[in-house]
């Protein structure tokens, strides 16, 4: 596999051989549970993940009505949520539309975690649409895939700020340790590097610092804690971020289309 973000003609003709045997070139390959592509768009991984979640949602529908709701939620956490959390700050930092397939599959599975009647499918005879899922997410304290990606990204950035992440990863970021809290401007906890490529803007190196600076400043302005958020230990920080994301997720009407997810406001 040759990584490139362009359809470069010389690269298409480039072959590698060992001992006279040409190595087969592939466009995508699974590595540590994540499907890598030669152009690093993550489309293959996202499509495969959406299919897997949709298939696992079928298991939830078969269990619905047979087991208590707490068991359904355990199954959801095992078969759905675990896949959404895994490396989501790697494959999920693209545009909102790029993960629509996954969000659709997640909403399908969420409709099955309550034993009450939730219309899960479109009725072609009556024209009835599937029920809205925003209240189901709220009742069960679940994060959408957009906010799961945001949470994982913020936690990763906080580990880097606390210098508890691996050194090689920490070296990729520029932590600002000289913060003037008396300034009228919002402090920047990470210095954001310049970028000429749109593809780079959709990586943790660029989007991570932007998201962290914005969210942490918003939380510090709420003054709900005597300790600034950026100075918290990891577990209190995770809890604070989860509450913030759930609160922002529950705001507004039931229409997800107009939902302003923090991940896409930076």
Annotated model-derived regions:
Residues 85-99, 205-266:
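Charged boundary/loop elements
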Residues 20-90:
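Basic, alpha-helical interaction scaffolds
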Residues 1-27:
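Short, conserved micro-motifs composed of acidic
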Residues 23-26, 66-75, 131, 140-149, ...:
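Structural motif
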């Amino acid at each position: 596999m040759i990584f490139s973000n362009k359809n470069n003609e010389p690269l298409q003709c480039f072959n590698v051989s060992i001992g006279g045997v040409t190595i087969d070139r592939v466009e995508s390959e699974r590595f540590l549970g994540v499907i890598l592509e030669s152009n690093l768009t993550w489309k293959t991984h996202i499509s495969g993940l959406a299919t897997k979640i949709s298939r696992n949602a079928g298991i939830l529908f078969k269990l619905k009505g047979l087991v208590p709701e707490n068991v359904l939620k355990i199954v959801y956490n095992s078969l759905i949520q675990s896949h959404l959390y895994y490396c989501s700050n790697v494959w999920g930092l693209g545009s909102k539309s790029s993960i629509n397939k996954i969000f659709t599959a997640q909403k399908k599975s969420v409709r099955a975690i309550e034993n009450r009647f939730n219309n899960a499918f479109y009725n072609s005879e009556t024209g009835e649409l599937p029920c809205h899922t925003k209240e189901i997410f709220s009742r069960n304290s679940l994060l959408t895939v957009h906010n799961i990606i945001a949470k994982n990204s913020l936690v990763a950035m906080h580990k880097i700020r606390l210098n508890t992440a691996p050194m090689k990863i920490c070296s990729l970021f520029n932590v600002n340790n000289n913060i003037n809290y008396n300034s009228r401007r919002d402090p920047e906890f990470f210095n954001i590097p310049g970028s000429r490529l749109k593809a780079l803007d959709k990586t943790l190196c660029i989007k991570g610092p932007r998201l962290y600076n914005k969210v942490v400043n918003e939380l510090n302005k709420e003054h709900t804690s005597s300790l600034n958020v950026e100075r918290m230990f990891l577990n209190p920080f995770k809890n604070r971020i989860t509450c913030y994301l759930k609160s922002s997720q529950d705001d507004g009407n039931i229409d997800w289309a107009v939902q302003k997810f923090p991940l896409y406001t930076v």
